[in-house]
Amino acid sequence: MRKLAFIIIISALTTAVQAQRTVTLQECINLATDNNLQLKQGAAGVEFSERAANLSRLLLLPNLNLGSSYFWNFGYTIDPVTNLPLANSFQTNGYQATSTMNLFSGGTISNTIKKTKTDLQVAGMNYKEALENVQFQVIVAYLAVMFAEEQLNIANQKINTTELQLNNSKKLAQAGSIPEGNLLTIEAQLAQDQLSVIQSQNQLDKTYLDLKLLLQLDPTENIKITFPDISKVDNILNAPVPDALTVANYAIANKASIKKYEYQLLSDGLNKKIAGAAALPTLSLIGQVGTNYSNATYPPIITEADPYGTQINNNLSEVVGISLQIPIFNNGQVLLNKQNADLAIINTQLNQQIAINTMRQNVTQAINDLKAAIASYAAAEKNLAAAQSAFDFAEKKFNMGTASSFDYTNAINIKAQAESTLVQAKYDMIFKSKIIDYYLDKTLDF
């Protein structure tokens, strides 16, 4: 029965492993890029702006409209074909083709074309900003999983150490080298270590859930990250920390979150010109071709109406003309639109300055945080070395029976805490360095 249960457990574990999906950092970035809803919205915005930019060039061409009408006329009415008054009822039918070409409109068309192209650049910058943010969020979430994995490993290693020492202590107690009461302290420590493993596993599960939600994956899907090579931590320690002013100037000149305001200001300026052009005269070339039919039209002597096709052909007319429109009063709408355009420019300038100020503050803080993280990691390395030496010494004394179980378990806890602190300092330093890489447009991979 036990053998059967063991086989069932092994089969279940094998199935779970087979169903597990292994993902790399780059695969996570690709998944987030493909699945993120905000990015899909941004891509749709870019496509919308691109179509608007392409169609705006058609404004340079003349338009063409076809029209047709059919009327029943009663009472005293002018026949549109003969232009004679008729007192009887009759029916008329007409066709028109009209084309209008803009000759002058104060630059409205040319500025509209320029504006749609600029709006496309704004949409592109917005999408790039969203893409960079999503990629950075994936890096942060991936690092959180890596950190939780290492914390769980430390907790498991601590259990192994405590279990090993418990077995040794039992042998020493049986030999009379240490009192049996020392075993209780170590057993209590083992229970605490088991609780730490449960808590670490729960934190790991949470970080995996956060990562899956970011990647728009099913929360129940079983994934496992692969650990990238982060052995170049010493490079961060030894490399000079970039100057805050240099990093800030680069970010302000190149990051999409700032550059989008440059294009937005261009768009706002063109919008102001378009609003101002509404106060200028417009000149248009108009051409029209039309024809009419009336069932009340008769040729001399003959009492029957001309055939439909004959009238349509004979009544064909062509008109070419020029139309000039001079705006005099438009209920203040032109003035209001110009004022709103000015306010839009001011608002964009303020948003741009706020973004620049925020960027400088964030970069300065990020540089300070990186310096502090490097110092913390170096201190954590020294702390672990000292804790390891203290643990080795306490273990030797405990095995000789000259140290209490309390002293020994305390040394274990201090060493485990030092290991945890070093891991935390390592990932904090990597994270802080990646923030600087983000501002400098360097690769966010490891």
Protein language model features and the residues they cover:
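Sec/SRP-type N-terminal targeting helices
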Residues: 40-44, 57, 89, 103-131, ...
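Small/polar, glycine/serine/threonine/aspartate-rich low-complexity segments that form flexible
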Residues: 67-101, 229-239, 273, 286-326
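Bacterial Sec-pathway N-terminal export signals of envelope proteins
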Residues: 19-67, 75, 219, 226-266, ...
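Positively charged n-region of N-terminal signal peptides that target proteins for export
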Residues: 1-4, 20
